[in-house]
Structures are given as structure tokens and as C-alpha cells.
Amino acid sequence: MSSPPPDGLGVRRATVDDAPAIDELITAADVAVQGWSESSVPELLGWWRMMDLEHSSWVLHDEESILAYAAGFAHGDNFELDGFVHPDHQGRGLGAWLLARGEDRAGELRKPRLQTFSLAADDRAHRLFEQFGMRQLRRYYRMMIELEEAPLPARLPDGLELETFDPGEAKAFHDALIEAFEDEWNFVAMPFDQWRELRLVQDPDFDPTLWFVVRDGEEIAAVMRNEPDRSGAGFVGALGVRKPWRKRGIALALLQHAFGEFYRRGKRRVALGVDAENPTGATRLYERAGMQVAFEAVAYGKELR
């Protein structure tokens, strides 16, 4: 924290105990831009499990409350920073100070690129990023569907079988997931041991009955990882089909199966995130399944060397 914060504010690292207050900050920032937020304490804690808060987080505060916050993590060649300023305290240079700290941390980790995100509707954030020398890289959609009635049963192509995930086959699931996503923009494969610890051990919401595998004989053709609840909605965390099995309706069948399972559990809304320029045409698939764009986010990046 080499540079003092603006206006004599205090600065410290985030801790798990800060989660409720920081969630309130994020919610206020989202609501100011788009009128609603899907932030929650469990989701925030999930992100923090991937971060080194002791070295890669910053909390700006006065004597009464947290005014701004950012945290990040190394992701391939990027240092990815996620930051928020309370709408009542914008225009004080807090966001620029946090970006500078993210750039400093990227240098410490020898990462050649700083990357961050904002809601597509947040013009103030876009101006800040551009003034900081960043450029727009990619757009992402949060897509949702409201389930007004029980979905029709999913139908897979002949010869394929849908199974519930067996934690004893986690390595095969992980391998199939990596292969399915290897061509995605900004994708970095997480080592299996780290992935297993994060998803199967540390995650309090891990529910193997919401993870699915499509098999073609002994081969895994597709995998799906779902979360039981994110801000009141069932959430599709990952859906991947290996290349030899694409264009056969498997992804749509998996999605419909997940819709049905969420509906059976009382969830009437299902959401997911997707790269708007996904090379496999996932956005069109989700639209065919009845999903619509709820909001857009934008990725910005800055080359540091």
C-alpha cells in the first residue's frame, strides 16, 4: 500500500468478517447503476476463496463505514481486480486509487496485464478505466429464465446416458471440463488438486446431485456443474461438451434437465453467465432454451509491459 489513500481515509486488508459490510457496498453500487443486484455474502465468500486477501485486497474506510473496496487474484497472465466504490463517495478518487493498487500488485506478481470488470451500464466506471489507460476487451451476459411450469423431460441422442456426478470420478469430470473450455477466451485451466479443493471441499454449497455427466459408453461426452442457489436463483456454474460430441443437442438437453431439477426443488428462476462472443455459439443455445439477457458486464484490460 505504497501510496496513501485519498482524503486521509483509512486503508486495510479485507477479512472474512467484512463480508456483510462489503456485500452491502457492492449491492449499493449495483443498485445505483441498474436498480438491482445479485450480490450476496455467500457469493462474495466464494470469490474470496480464490483470492489472497492478506496481500491482494484493499478496504478504504472512515471512522464509521467502508467506502470502497477491491480485491484480485492471479489468473494466467492477468491480475484480475474486482472493485467497488459506494455511490455516495464517487468522485473522490477512490476508484483510481484502487486501480493503482491493483497495478502495483500485478507488478509484484510479475503479471503483464491488469484486468477488471464493470456493469455495461456503468458509464462512470468506463470513463475511469479509459482514463487509467485500459481498453474494452470483452462483454459478458448474465442470462436468466423464469420457469412458469415444469419443463419437458430432456431428450438425449440415442446411445448417450445422463448420470449424476460421482465424486469418485472427479478427475475425469475435471479433464472433460478443461477440454470443453480450452478454446474459451481468457480461460486458464485450474490444476486438479486446486479445483477439487475449491469446488468439492471448501464450497459449502457443493451438491453432487446437481452436477451431471453425459456418457457415450466409457467416454464422458459432456459435464455440467450447478449451484443450488445464487441470489434466489438456481445457477448453472459450468456446462461443457467435448468437441467430438458437439452439434448433437447435448448441451440443450443438459440445460433442460437442470431446469427440471431446479423446478422440482422449488426454484422458478435459473441463471448463468456467458461470454457474449463465445466461440461455440452458447449464447444462441441459451436463447433457444428460453433464457434472456438480464444484464451485461464488460471486461477491461491494460498491458503493463
Predicted feature residues:
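Short amphipathic alpha-helix that is part of the acyltransferase structural core
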Residues: 1-45, 155-190
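Active-site/acyl-donor-binding loops of N-acyltransferases
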Residues: 130-151, 256, 265-305
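Conserved acetyl-CoA-binding loop-helix of GNAT-fold acetyltransferases
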Residues: 91-104, 238-241, 247-264, 283-288
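Conserved donor-binding loop and adjoining core beta-sheet/short helix segment
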Residues: 16-19, 24-109, 115-120, 216-217, ...
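Acyl-donor-binding surface of acyltransferase catalytic domains
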Residues: 1-5, 73-80, 85-160, 298-302
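Phosphate-binding active sites in nucleotide-utilizing proteins
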Residues: 182-243, 251-252
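Generic hydrophobic alpha-helical scaffold/packing signal
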Residues: 177, 211-215, 224-227, 237, ...
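Short loop/turn microsegments at loop-to-beta-strand junctions
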Residues: 10, 54-56, 208-210
